[in-house]
Structure formats: C-alpha cells, structure tokens
C-alpha cells in the first residue's frame, strides 16, 4: 500500500515505517461497551517519517472526534499548580501580563481560570458545543468553533496563544498553525505542548502511540 502524503507539507512518507504496533486500541476515547467486547478488534498503527519536512506521523485516518478530543477530564491540584507556574513564567518572559490570550482546543475551559490567575485576559476556543456550554455556565469566556475551519473568534487578534496537547490530534496541523497566526497579532507569543518523539522513544513510552495522535514532534519539527 502506498503511504499517504505528509499531513504537514504534502511530501512523501518513508516507505519503511519508523514504528509498527499491532493489536492497538481503535481510539483513546469512547471505549467499547462490555456488550461489544466480543466483536471489538485491535488495529495496527503504522508510524512513518516525511522525507521532506521530517515530521513523524501516523499513516492513517484521524479518529471521528478529532475536533473535540478531550485530553483530560479535569485539572488535578498538582497539574493546576504546575500549569499556573508555567503560565506565570510565560507572562513574565514575554511581558504578557494583562494581555489577551487564546486557548486553542480549550475543552471546558479550565485553563482559562489558570490563565486569569497568571495575569492574562483569556478566551477559549473549542469545537465541542457541549464543552463550550459547560465552560460558559462556569463563567468562562468561551467561543465555539474548530481552528482548522477558518472560525472567527471575538476579541481577535490576540496578543498570545496557548495550545496544550492538541495539535498532535489534528489531520492538518499546518492549517491550524496558519489560522492561529491569522487570529493573533504579528508579534504574538505562543506556548505549545505536543508529544516529544525523542523522549517517548528514549523512555519507551509506547502507550503514547495511539490512533488519536497523528503527529509526533521533535525539536526540529
């Protein structure tokens, strides 16, 4: 089977896979019900590298819910403290205190409260209308829409943006990055977290290779 083109640059993927994993779950969310165990089957994950831009990626289609993937149910006390320290450092380093910030892939908007405490004026962008409704009911400044579809966000252009464990789920990360650029000022600063391929391989964290994750990044990519 001919590999699909690179989801970032459109170049050819390596004929030889970087990693092949068999018997893997079909998705990291929406697990089968007990009544479905008898017919549920694992899938093979084929990971290849682009011969052009070097991005390592899943050679396959995205899961059906990629627009509103949920990376965590909620922020634990420890996670919240960790993120708050990061956001405070981000604000100080780039002189962003009091500035507007867009959280891309905000889920229910829990990070907006962290961003507010860190001194930002935050807005959360989320594709799931259900998550947006929950966020708004908690008093959070939420906008509904998917970053890959040219959505307009009230309050743009923003002076900063964050995207936490979201870009790796998108079938066209380059489109999302260009759209983020269109929604932010020319000198905007960004804070992005994505899977670190070098770390995953060094620590043998193969559980991070799931159908939901379409891209695996290095410092170069």
Predicted regions mapped to residue ranges:
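Conserved SAM-binding loop
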Residues: 88-204, 214-221
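Short, conserved clusters of charged catalytic residues that mark active-site
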Residues: 1, 85, 175
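Fe-S ferredoxin-like electron-transfer domains
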Residues: 45-118, 123
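A generic "functional-site adjacency" signal
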Residues: 3, 44-47, 84, 129, ...
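Conserved histidines in hydrophobic membrane contexts and catalytic metal-binding motifs
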Residues: 208
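N-terminal juxtadomain amphipathic helix
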Residues: 1-78
